[in-house]
């Protein structure tokens, strides 16, 4: 049975943050270079690859390409117009030295490996 996607205001949608938290580059909803972790921390592709080495500075997980929310409302209530991106800019919570040490410590551990496996 096919179930319709709920489209009321209580439906959670991925938070589309407007900027890279590292370099503050604008990342509009259609930005193909936007990357997110499982907590929706948002960075540009350049910072993820060259500064963070695919290590989220907050949770320590890896990154994936952020999905692009459709501009056209193909289904009722589901579009960037109906579910707009956030306008709240987010910035790093840690110093650059701390980020470098954090990344160096865990960058060679795949994000899918649990701590229990490492012990």
Descriptions of predicted regions:
Residues 9-119:
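Intrinsically disordered, low-complexity regulatory regions in eukaryotic proteins
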């Amino acid at each position: 049975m096919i179930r319709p996607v709920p489209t009321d205001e209580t439906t959670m949608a991925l938070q589309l943050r407007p900027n890279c938290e590292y370099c503050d580059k604008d990342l509009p909803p259609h930005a193909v270079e936007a990357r997110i972790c499982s907590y929706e921390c948002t960075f540009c592709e350049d910072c993820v690859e060259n500064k963070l080495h695919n290590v989220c500075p907050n949770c320590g997980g890896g990154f994936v390409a952020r999905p692009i929310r459709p501009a056209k409302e193909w289904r009722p209530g589901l579009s960037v117009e109906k579910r707009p991106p956030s306008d709240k800019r987010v910035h790093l919570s840690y110093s650059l030295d701390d980020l470098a040490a954090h990344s160096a410590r865990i960058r060679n551990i795949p994000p899918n490996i649990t701590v229990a496996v490492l012990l």
